[in-house]
Amino acid sequence: MKTILSTQTVDIPDNVDVTLKGRTVSVKGPRGVLRREFNHINLELRLLGKKQKKLRVDKWWGNRKELATVRTICSHVQNMIKGVTLGFRYKMRSVYAHFPINVVIQETGSLVEIRNFLGEKYIRRVRMRPGVNCALSAAQKDELVLEGNDIELVSNSAALIQQATTVKNKDIRKFLDGIYVSEKGTVVEPES
């Protein structure tokens, strides 16, 4: 059965500006600008109100799968708003049983070098996604901190680091060495 109209709105905070150009959404906030295209999805995007502080997403005559995209677009825009106001921070911890993993940050936080993984001489190099900054934690030993405005780029960079330290040809229940995400949060603490 087709639903005639499915609608959802996203509230825009006062310190954030959202502009629409076709189905391209630009979100500008205190931490920077994020831009995302939704041209591949057949939806209507519209800013509401005199001050344009609401974004409405409409889908006409959609089946179940097409109606699900309405909430998906709203979630993406909410993540963009959260990114330009608070920013995203992922913390990663090195886990090792015997050989200590040495992590070196190169090129001012855009390249991570992983040495001595399982005692190997091979140096693993992982480049961060654009807009993601990586640093070693001063307070905690064996901890990496990834920060950025785009949640997808930050989480993808964390995934690349984790995948670089996968154990090959061994029983992974026994060989638990690697660098894993230990905490997900925001750079700026939200006021509750």
Swiss-Prot record:
It is found in: Cytoplasm. It comes from the Eukaryota. Keywords: Cytoplasm, Ribonucleoprotein, Ribosomal protein. PROSITE patterns: RIBOSOMAL_L6_2. GO terms for cellular component: cytosolic large ribosomal subunit. One of its GO terms (molecular function) is rRNA binding. InterPro entries: Ribosomal_uL6-like, Ribosomal_uL6-like_a/b-dom_sf, Ribosomal_uL6_a/b-dom, Ribosomal_uL6_CS2. GO terms for biological process: cytoplasmic translation. Component of the large ribosomal subunit. Belongs to the universal ribosomal protein uL6 family. Component of the large ribosomal subunit. The ribosome is a large ribonucleoprotein complex responsible for the synthesis of proteins in the cell. This is Large ribosomal subunit protein uL6. The gene is rpl9.
